[in-house]
Amino acid sequence: MSAGTSATGPRRGPPGLEEATSKKKQKDRANQESKDGDPRRVSMPRKEPTKDELLLDWRQSSDKVVVKLRVGTGPICLEEVDAAFTDTDCVVRLPDGRQWGGVFFAKIQSSCTKVQTRKGGLLQLALPKKVPLLTWPSLLKKPLGTQELVPGLRCQENGQELSPIALEPGSEPRRAKQEARNQKRAQGRGEVGSGASPGAQAGPSAKRAVHLCRGPEGEGSMDGPGPQGDAPSFLSDSATQVEAEEQLHVPPVNPQTSLLGSEKNLALLTVEKTVSPRSDSVSPVMIRNRDPEKDDHFKEEMAVGADPAALADEPESMVNLAFVKNDSYEKGPDSVVVHVYVKESRRDTSRVLFREQDFTLIFQTRDGNFLRLHPGCGPHTIFRWQVKLRNLIEPEQCTFCFTASRIDICLRKRQSQRWGGLEAPATRVGGAKVAVPTGPTPLDSTPPGGGPLPLTGQEEARAVEKEKPKARSEDSGLDGVVARTPLEHVTPKPEPHLASPKPTCMVPPMPHSPVSGDSVEEDEEEEKKVCLPGFTGLVNLGNTCFMNSVIQSLSNTRELRDFFHDRSFEAEINYNNPLGTGGRLAIGFAVLLRALWKGTHQAFQPSKLKAIVASKASQFTGYAQHDAQEFMAFLLDGLHEDLNRIQNKPYTETVDSDGRPDEVVAEEAWQRHKMRNDSFIVDLFQGQYKSKLVCPVCAKVSITFDPFLYLPVPLPQKQKVLPIYYFAREPHSKPIKFLVSVSKENSSASEVLESLSQSVHVKPESLRLAEVIKNRFHRVFLPSHSLDAVSPTDVLLCFELLSPELAKERVVVLEVQQRPQVPSIPISKCAACQRKQQSEDEKLKRCTRCYRVGYCNQFCQKTHWPDHKGLCRPENIGYPFLVSVPASRLTYARLAQLLEGYARYSVSVFQPPFQPGRMALESQSPGCTTLLSTSSLEAGDSEREPIQPSELQLVTPVAEGDTGAHRMWPPADRGPVPSTSGISSEMLASGPMEGCSLLAGERVSRPEAAVPGYQHSRESVSAHTPQFFIYKIDASSREQRLEDKGDTPLELGDDCSLALVWRNNERLQEFVLVASKELECAEDPGSAGEAARAGHFTLDQCLNLFTRPEVLAPEEAWYCPQCKQHREASKQLLLWRLPNVLIVQLKRFSFRSFIWRDKINDLVEFPVRNLDLSKFCIGQKEEQLPSYDLYAVINHYGGMIGGHYTACARLPSDRSSQRSDVGWRLFDDSTVTTVDESQVVTRYAYVLFYRRRNSPVERPPRAAHAEHHPDLGPAAEAAASQASRIWQELEAEEEMVPEGPGPLGPWGPQDWVGPPPRGPTTSDEGCLRYFVLGTVAALVALVLNVFYPLVSQSRWR
């Protein structure tokens, strides 16, 4: 450049003066570098390389170029090799001074280049092609000019020497005399210098070939010829002005301070092209403001032919700013808006310069607050801030404008895609990570890796086609301006070290992100990973295990992971949705997901995501415990609102069936739901169920279809094991004892009947369940009756009955009870006066109804009758039973066979030998037998007392209303009158009664004769005296003895029952001894482990409970449109449409009331493979069954007061849910370990994640979403700006997370009630307060759950 500047541009001075100035600056530079402690660059003798010292060989593939340099025979230290890459060229400098570089044939991806060492003294350069599948005919472009060649800068391509690269002479830029002062100033405000300073050197345009230059000292002043022999000129007419905009300017370079020898200056120099020799200066070309209302012109006035010494003493300099307060957001898919907050900026001297990869803001300001931040600067100081952009822009379409408080810059994207941030991320140079500073780099330099992010093949192809017609305008737009900035020879100020975020690591290739396999493998080899991808844990921030388990489970949802990994979600962010977070939640979740799958952290801290969630849901503020399912529902709902494709939600109404087909109503309801809710979350997680309501009064049926995000399936309540004794229809089969598990609450008899039905292979309609108390039927259960009051100690009998459909006629069902004819209970004292029996002559008289008490006389009996009246009833023996006989075959013989067959299992009967002289009672009246009542004989009662005639106190019973449901013996309303003769006067007056006589020798045959279709002859049945009598008890509780009518069927109604009375009276001939015994039965082998399985359920049982009809509670009453009133209707939920990812919540937590809260820890057995839901889904009849495979489980340990969450998950393959790309792992906060699949099913499972087989989620094309992104309003712009800042902050903080192990294990103090040990905003006082409050809450809950129920129960007793 010239030594002076004018109002229109820089001008050249006399050749002699400039040469002297150049030598003076060289001397000053050497002195300064010696003071800075870098004598190597000054004192090391220069070694002139020859062309044979570097041997070049190169090869190419479809997506990259590999260059090999033979630099010697010894080992190479990669840290001493200086390498600089741009998209078009490169420079490699060796420690001994040799260098190689040039302009490539085509563009490369400078951000992905690598420098590696190989055996044999080889240096290998890996250069990814920017346009894959493009074949390079040569490595380097053929130079256009024929300038002097730099010794040693010669290359060979495939063994053949290439033409040398053209160079240009240059000269050392001058330094200002205030260098020391500027260096001190730079410590407070960043880098200071001009276009030729070490921190801001001229660089090539992204479209211009670069030529290396290096000349001897004193050679190449600015008066020397240019590349085409033209001297610089000052342009006067408009035609030459346009040409001047197309020219490139090259400042002279010194060999010791040029790009080739500086580690900080990694950019290449641009080629200067001048137009006309008519003038010795060149006018700068500026980019005008695109705003027609605010068209600012930057004017520079510099004296023509000014003294160079005066320039050196210039008081002001251009200050390169490292940071300016700003924010940015993406306005739609095509533009980015940047707000730079600088007040009182001077419009006449401020402007913005745009290039396709960056922009530079040059301004002056009068703001005192801003100037105080930069000591030594004033209103005339020129500030410069440059931003390297993340992707390419259209410089011609970018605009800017000035306001009183800020500068607004609008960038037009070249490609319509989301950037995810403003500045370009970090990159690598020479195989090592290099962080690109967030501060500016010079406009005329291109730092390595500062180019746009690598594009996919399709995007790159579109970018190449779009770049071709604009090559001329882009090449000539800014490059001429870069070299003509004022004060470019001012002394540079060193830039302080800036703490920059580390670059993000490359993630494994996603299905929707075609990345080169070779480059990915090389990146994985170079990357220093601390764990395998997918084995990164999450730090427990303090009781945040509920959040960690949910995030880890969702991160293993294959479709969701890929959707956020390849950044497809960016095109669907809805900034206008007031129900969302403006994209902040989606971006935060995406960054967290990427960190979990990079493998660069042992544990990651999800504090940013928690803060975003807490800003939207205040219940998650702080570090209290929460429900994992509640957090999961909020997170998925928040992601849905952030990604909702609907910008303006229309009003919709609930769709009712009104008699229409379910298929039509369901589809209409789903489409209406999609009119307001359409996102990737809906496509992946949401299903649809059918809700059916039935009014109990008018039978109005209402059917609606509603969406669901997860299925909250209830668990059966705590189980109880009930012993059930099953009696087959025929008595020859021994009873079988079954153990059946039912719920302690809300259980019904139908559960038992269905369970037994599956065991005995009998229809539930043919079974009857009855409860037995004190050897009599207490009640017979209908299928709908509740079993809540039944305890495991109660006796339950189940009987198989003959169905009328099978018999094809009326079937008579009879209840049968057993009792002895005469009880054998000794009596020692009077029940009324408590006087003991004195002698045999004064025996106590028994009560003839119950035979359980005795009296001295009738007076004592009448006195005691009020107390004895309620207890006066006979007691049965054995077990009662039910018999079912067809009406046409109900003969006395058949009935006797059935009764004796059933009775022998519960009573012991023994007939003693016949004793001559025993009194026969056949001649007595029937009243002696029909009115006798006995008490039950205790099993094992050896003390027996002979019954004398005087002890038989008989009375005539008077019927009384039966107060019991199954009362077999009515109490008398008046007391019996004792008689010393043993026979009352009423019986004597009654005379002979019918039915008393019995046939001699009558005996019942064996029960085996009761087989259907087999009938014994009457002679065989009547061969012996019967052991019992049969009495019929009618509805009025009156008894009548049945008579044997031969083959004539007995006439018995359905409202009567039977009593089997054993002949145990010792005064009768052939009496029997009878006593109760334990029921003879066989044990069911399948019930052996029922007690152990009492706390085990299956997922099918839970789904059955979910789909079972239930009656609404009064507070949930449904408004019937037909009755016009709220009704406690019957509600039933049925699955209609199943999602691709099914989430099932096991409702382990029971909230019956504020006091009664409980957690069910019983095991729920759920399938890991092949969950078939075809029997639960009534809609969408498809060819393939809805089969699901488990891929994640959230576990909860502990109870209601405190607990801990963990997760088990695997990453299913993208093609088949049965296979896994990453196997099962256990996520316990920051600890991640592998587990076997058999260890996944535990009693602590809380939330289950299933993936459907053979049902991929189709993503809509990105172009289809263009209509969902109209121009954003002010509120949406603010949300987009904040979301963009969060994306940058999260990416920056992603690499600064502590990698050590997290908190304590699963039972550590952080997972229980208490404050976090290291909360970011929690002080020691706050921790103590949280601990005290948590302890008090735990004590209150303990009192309410334990002591209050005890007090309340004792009160009601």
Curated annotation (Swiss-Prot):
Membrane topology: Single-pass membrane protein
Region (Disordered): 1-52, 162-239, 275-296, 432-479, 962-981, 1259-1278, 1292-1320
Binding-site positions, Zn(2+) 2: C847, C850, H868, C872
Chain intervals with Basic and acidic residues compositional bias: 28-52, 171-182, 459-475, 1259-1271
Known role: Deubiquitinating enzyme that regulates the degradation of various proteins by removing ubiquitin moieties, thereby preventing their proteasomal degradation. Stabilizes RNF123, which promotes CDKN1B degradation and contributes to cell proliferation. Decreases the levels of ubiquitinated proteins during skeletal muscle formation and acts to repress myogenesis. Modulates transcription of major myofibrillar proteins. Also involved in turnover of endoplasmic-reticulum-associated degradation (ERAD) substrates.
Induction entry: By streptozotocin and fasting in skeletal muscle.
Stored Gene3D superfamilies: 2.60.40.790, 6.10.140.2220, Cysteine proteinases
Subunit details: Interacts with RNF123. Interacts with BIRC2/c-IAP1, BIRC3/c-IAP2 and XIAP/BIRC4. Interacts with HIF1A (via N-terminus).
Topological region Cytoplasmic: 1-1330
Zinc finger annotations (MYND-type) as residue ranges: 830-872
This protein's name: Ubiquitin carboxyl-terminal hydrolase 19
Phosphoserine modification, residue list: S221, S283
GO cellular component: cytosol; endoplasmic reticulum membrane
This protein's encoding gene: Usp19
Stored InterPro entries: CS_dom (IPR007052), HSP20-like_chaperone (IPR008978), Papain-like_cys_pep_sf (IPR038765), Peptidase_C19_UCH (IPR001394), Ub_carboxyl-term_hydrolase (IPR050185), USP_CS (IPR018200), USP_dom (IPR028889), Znf_MYND (IPR002893)
UniProt catalytic activity: Thiol-dependent hydrolysis of ester, thioester, amide, peptide and isopeptide bonds formed by the C-terminal Gly of ubiquitin (a 76-residue protein attached to proteins as an intracellular targeting signal)
Top-level EC class as recorded in UniProt: hydrolase
CS domain boundaries: 51-140, 321-423
Active site: C545 (nucleophile), H1204 (proton acceptor)
Free-text tissue specificity from the UniProt record: Expressed in testis, heart, kidney and skeletal muscle. Low levels of expression are detectable in all other tissues screened.
Membrane-spanning parts: 1331-1351
EC number: 3.4.19.12
Entry keyword set: Endoplasmic reticulum, Hydrolase, Membrane, Metal-binding, Phosphoprotein, Protease, Repeat, Thiol protease, Transmembrane, Transmembrane helix, Ubl conjugation pathway, Zinc, Zinc-finger
One Gene Ontology MF term: Hsp90 protein binding
Residues involved in Zn(2+) 1 binding: C830, C833, C856, C860
